[in-house]
Amino acid sequence: MAVLNINGLSYVADAPADTRLLWVIREHLRLTGTKFGCGMGLCGACTVHLDGEAVRSCQIELADAEGSRITTIEGLDPKGQHPVQQAWSELQVPQCGYCQSGQLISAAELLDTNENPTDDDIDNAMSGNICRCGTYVRIKKAIKEAVELKKQV
């Protein structure tokens, strides 16, 4: 059993210590915005923030997450007003939408660490996120729009 801080709330997870964080979030806590893609940490669909850093939750064991601040897509901004969420919506980025929670979490980390990312910065930050629909051009455009939206806040 572990106590987790997810999206600012305390949760008790009754699961073995080696259970992957992804399954604790989705199956035990029913926060289903974080997606299962590959299970190997390669696609980025399961990305969450762990103490502010974008990580693949399918690669993190429950025991390693205990005591950390975890943010899922549900907690990025519960009202959907984070600059990346606004830009994604305004520019209609998603096609199927499956990868988008991981894309948004990765983009949010980029903007937290780099106020004015270059195209190369964006490519590097987002390189671990695969979009099977190929919306990469829209994703990059939305990140640039989010930079501008963040400046207005």
What feature does the model see in each segment?
Residues 1-153:
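Signature of N-terminal electron-transfer/Fe-S-associated modules in redox systems
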